[in-house]
Swiss-Prot record:
It is found in: Secreted. It comes from Conus textile. Disulfide bonds join 51-65, 58-69, 64-75. Its main location: secreted. It comes from the Eukaryota. Residues 1-19 form the signal peptide. The keyword Signal applies. This is Conotoxin TxMEKL-021. Belongs to the conotoxin O2 superfamily.
Amino acid sequence: MEKLTILLLVAVVLMSTQALPQGGGEKRPRENIRFLSKRKSNAERWREGSCTSWLATCTDASQCCTGVCYKRAYCALWE
């Protein structure tokens, strides 16, 4: 069973290294290679402008880069 697991791991590594050069040689932007993270970090959301910065007005925590909408009035660093 251990040999099978090691064999599968080696096969996955070999397949992943072969898949990288088959991209056609073009350089892809970094944001297109996000296969490990599903959520954007607060800094990424702020850079893209999809969230409001600290002390900006808000009505919901999802609007704030920090994730904290204090008393449904403004974005705070912490509660």
